């Protein structure tokens, strides 16, 4: 059945994208490009966005099929809730930007509060209503040490889900970058899940992986469609949730290392400019810095994918030992 889920997720996305692209163009759901960004990006103005709807719909449909046939499907139900929750936040943000012609979208406060709400509901469903059982301790790799947090673990969940949701969002600035890194990440978590005996989570990772594989051909350079916040916020939230449910939270630092680096580059850039008036990078997130020093977009993407693959394998090794 795993092969069936994989094929279904792949086919649904691959078929939906070319159907959605002309619809988005007709409705003028095009991406606005920052004028201060690399000039090579200006030609992308008007490229359809909100393409994340395709793979999210594929994930929802395939997961609902899996829930019928999978024993102990509660983890899939919970992951589906997070997918829809963070995806909905991203969709509203994209809608305001594209339809209402407000480049700011949701305010940072609105987005943050909505993300916190999803994280708290996830904690309540899992640890209060016991939809799934996972530890409320953070496990330190290569040791038998676990830091117990009890109900304070909800604070960690909020930090982890909100942090990685926004990290993937920041990374989604080059054609295929976030999609490719997510494919690598879900591959690692699929393997880890099956090794750890978490079959339902493994099946969900397979669904994620193949849904994104169906999207990638349309998203690599030159991209015919962008995933938008609809896709990127959902992907980051799902990554954080999977690491939590596997009790392998810190593995995500390696499996999502490029997302972490991208986020840190923005934080360092802002802090440096506020404190010294000088910028560390030519532009942040750091993928734009490499473009501005002369790297082609495709070179940046492939190098970052390679870094993601190597660090992902390290994260996988940490998770299964």
Curated annotation (Swiss-Prot):
<feature type="transmembrane region" description="Helical">
    <location>
        <begin position="76"/>
        <end position="91"/>
    </location>
</feature>
<feature type="transmembrane region" description="Helical">
    <location>
        <begin position="151"/>
        <end position="165"/>
    </location>
</feature>
<feature type="transmembrane region" description="Helical">
    <location>
        <begin position="203"/>
        <end position="216"/>
    </location>
</feature>
<feature type="topological domain" description="Cytoplasmic">
    <location>
        <begin position="166"/>
        <end position="176"/>
    </location>
</feature>
<feature type="topological domain" description="Extracellular">
    <location>
        <begin position="70"/>
        <end position="75"/>
    </location>
</feature>
<dbReference type="GO" id="GO:0008360">
    <property type="term" value="P:regulation of cell shape"/>
</dbReference>
<keyword id="KW-0479">Metal-binding</keyword>
<dbReference type="GO" id="GO:0005886">
    <property type="term" value="C:plasma membrane"/>
</dbReference>
<protein>
    <recommendedName>
        <fullName>Phospho-N-acetylmuramoyl-pentapeptide-transferase</fullName>
        <ecNumber>2.7.8.13</ecNumber>
    </recommendedName>
</protein>
<dbReference type="InterPro" id="IPR018480">
    <property type="entry name" value="PNAcMuramoyl-5peptid_Trfase_CS"/>
</dbReference>
<keyword id="KW-0808">Transferase</keyword>
<feature type="transmembrane region" description="Helical">
    <location>
        <begin position="301"/>
        <end position="320"/>
    </location>
</feature>
<dbReference type="GO" id="GO:0071555">
    <property type="term" value="P:cell wall organization"/>
</dbReference>
<feature type="transmembrane region" description="Helical">
    <location>
        <begin position="112"/>
        <end position="133"/>
    </location>
</feature>
<feature type="topological domain" description="Cytoplasmic">
    <location>
        <begin position="92"/>
        <end position="111"/>
    </location>
</feature>
<keyword id="KW-0812">Transmembrane</keyword>
<feature type="topological domain" description="Cytoplasmic">
    <location>
        <begin position="269"/>
        <end position="300"/>
    </location>
</feature>
<feature type="transmembrane region" description="Helical">
    <location>
        <begin position="177"/>
        <end position="197"/>
    </location>
</feature>
<feature type="topological domain" description="Extracellular">
    <location>
        <begin position="198"/>
        <end position="202"/>
    </location>
</feature>
<keyword id="KW-0133">Cell shape</keyword>
<keyword id="KW-0460">Magnesium</keyword>
<dbReference type="GO" id="GO:0016780">
    <property type="term" value="F:phosphotransferase activity, for other substituted phosphate groups"/>
</dbReference>
<dbReference type="Pfam" id="PF00953">
    <property type="entry name" value="Glycos_transf_4"/>
</dbReference>
<feature type="topological domain" description="Cytoplasmic">
    <location>
        <begin position="217"/>
        <end position="232"/>
    </location>
</feature>
<dbReference type="GO" id="GO:0051301">
    <property type="term" value="P:cell division"/>
</dbReference>
<dbReference type="GO" id="GO:0044038">
    <property type="term" value="P:cell wall macromolecule biosynthetic process"/>
</dbReference>
<feature type="transmembrane region" description="Helical">
    <location>
        <begin position="1"/>
        <end position="21"/>
    </location>
</feature>
<keyword id="KW-0132">Cell division</keyword>
<keyword id="KW-1133">Transmembrane helix</keyword>
<feature type="topological domain" description="Extracellular">
    <location>
        <begin position="247"/>
        <end position="249"/>
    </location>
</feature>
<keyword id="KW-0961">Cell wall biogenesis/degradation</keyword>
<feature type="topological domain" description="Cytoplasmic">
    <location>
        <begin position="22"/>
        <end position="52"/>
    </location>
</feature>
<keyword id="KW-0573">Peptidoglycan synthesis</keyword>
<feature type="topological domain" description="Extracellular">
    <location>
        <begin position="134"/>
        <end position="150"/>
    </location>
</feature>
<dbReference type="GO" id="GO:0046872">
    <property type="term" value="F:metal ion binding"/>
</dbReference>
<dbReference type="GO" id="GO:0009252">
    <property type="term" value="P:peptidoglycan biosynthetic process"/>
</dbReference>
<keyword id="KW-0131">Cell cycle</keyword>
<feature type="transmembrane region" description="Helical">
    <location>
        <begin position="250"/>
        <end position="268"/>
    </location>
</feature>
<comment type="pathway">
    <text>Cell wall biogenesis; peptidoglycan biosynthesis.</text>
</comment>
<dbReference type="InterPro" id="IPR000715">
    <property type="entry name" value="Glycosyl_transferase_4"/>
</dbReference>
<keyword id="KW-0472">Membrane</keyword>
<feature type="transmembrane region" description="Helical">
    <location>
        <begin position="53"/>
        <end position="69"/>
    </location>
</feature>
């Amino acid at each position: 059945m795993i092969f069936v889920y994989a094929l279904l997720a792949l086919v649904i996305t691959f078929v939906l994208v070319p159907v959605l692209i002309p619809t988005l163009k007709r409705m003028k759901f095009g991406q606005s490009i920052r004028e201060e960004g690399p000039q090579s990006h200006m030609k992308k103005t008007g490229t359809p966005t909100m393409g994340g709807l395709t793979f999210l719909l594929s994930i929802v449909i395939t997961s609902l099929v899996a829930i019928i046939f999978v024993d102990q499907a509660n983890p899939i139900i919970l992951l589906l809730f997070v997918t829809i929750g963070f995806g909905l936040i991203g969709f509203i943000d994209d809608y305001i930007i594209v339809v209402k012609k407000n480049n700011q979208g949701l305010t940072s406060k609105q987005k943050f509060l909505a993300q916190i709400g999803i994280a708290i509901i996830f904690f309540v469903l899992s640890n209060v209503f016991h939809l799934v059982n996972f530890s409320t301790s953070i496990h330190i790799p290569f040791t038998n040490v676990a830091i117990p947090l009890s109900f304070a673990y909800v604070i960690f969940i909020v930090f982890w889900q909100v942090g990685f949701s926004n990290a993937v969002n920041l990374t989604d600035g080059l054609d295929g970058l976030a999609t490719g890194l997510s494919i690598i990440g879900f591959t690692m978590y699929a393997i880890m899940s099956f090794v750890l005996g978490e079959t339902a989570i493994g099946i969900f990772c397979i669904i994620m992986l193949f849904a994104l594989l169906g999207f990638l051909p349309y998203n690599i350079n030159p991209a015919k469609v962008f995933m938008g916040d609809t896709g990127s916020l959902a992907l980051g939230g799902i990554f954080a949730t999977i690491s939590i449910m596997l009790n392998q939270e810190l593995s995500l630092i390696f499996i999502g290392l490029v997302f972490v680096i991208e986020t840190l580059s923005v934080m360092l850039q802002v802090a440096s400019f506020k404190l010294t008036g000088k910028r560390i990078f030519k532009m942040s997130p750091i993928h734009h810095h490499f473009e501005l020093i002369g790297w082609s977009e495709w070179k940046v993407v492939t190098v970052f994918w390679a870094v993601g693959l190597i660090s992902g394998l390290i994260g996988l090794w940490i998770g299964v030992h």
